[in-house]
């Protein structure tokens, strides 16, 4: 049974400005493993990655019903499966997590659905 659905939209240019203003911005949003991937990327792809992870973590917090605040960005980790699709590898939720991250020229959108395991 679906117990939560969250979506989030991030402006890529706003994320880039935040990253340029603070050298610690990426390390606040990303886990160590995510940060390793982030630093291996270049140019626009780097900012898209950061914006996508931020949007996905915000979407998770909405689906989970907590919002970012009681849940920290570091409590969530999103890596790629063997096909390259994003998956949560760290979260406080024990059920199934479905995630989609989409990019356009100016925005990144993320959608997260939380589903209870069959009882």
From Swiss-Prot:
Q: Its domain of life?
A: Bacteria
Q: Where is this chain's protein located in or outside the cell?
A: Cytoplasm
Task: Supply the alphabetized keyword list.
Answer: Cytoplasm, Fatty acid biosynthesis, Fatty acid metabolism, Lipid biosynthesis, Lipid metabolism, Magnesium, Metal-binding, Transferase
Needed cofactors, names only, are: Mg(2+)
Q: Name one GO molecular function term.
A: holo-[acyl-carrier-protein] synthase activity
Q: Gene Ontology terms, cellular component aspect?
A: cytoplasm
The free-text function statement in the UniProt record for this protein reads: Transfers the 4'-phosphopantetheine moiety from coenzyme A to a Ser of acyl-carrier-protein.
In terms of NCBIfam families, this protein maps to: acpS (TIGR00516), pantethn_trn (TIGR00556)
User: What family is this?
Assistant: Belongs to the P-Pant transferase superfamily. AcpS family.
What's this protein's name? Holo-[acyl-carrier-protein] synthase
Q: What organism does this protein naturally occur in?
A: Streptococcus mutans serotype c (strain ATCC 700610 / UA159)
Species lineage: Bacteria, Bacillati, Bacillota, Bacilli, Lactobacillales
Gene expressing this chain? acpS
């Amino acid at each position: 049974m679906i117990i939560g659905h969250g979506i989030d939209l991030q402006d890529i240019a706003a994320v880039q400005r935040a990253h340029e203003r603070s050298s610690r911005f990426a390390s606040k949003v990303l886990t160590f493993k995510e940060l390793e991937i982030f630093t291996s990327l270049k140019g626009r792809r780097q900012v898209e990655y950061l914006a996508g992870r931020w949007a996905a973590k915000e979407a998770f917090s909405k689906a989970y019903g907590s919002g970012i605040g009681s849940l920290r960005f570091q409590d969530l980790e999103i890596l790629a499966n063997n096909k390259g699709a994003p998956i949560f590898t760290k979260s406080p939720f024990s059920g199934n997590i479905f995630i989609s991250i989409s990019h356009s020229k100016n925005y990144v959108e993320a959608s997260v659905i939380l589903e209870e395991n069959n009882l």
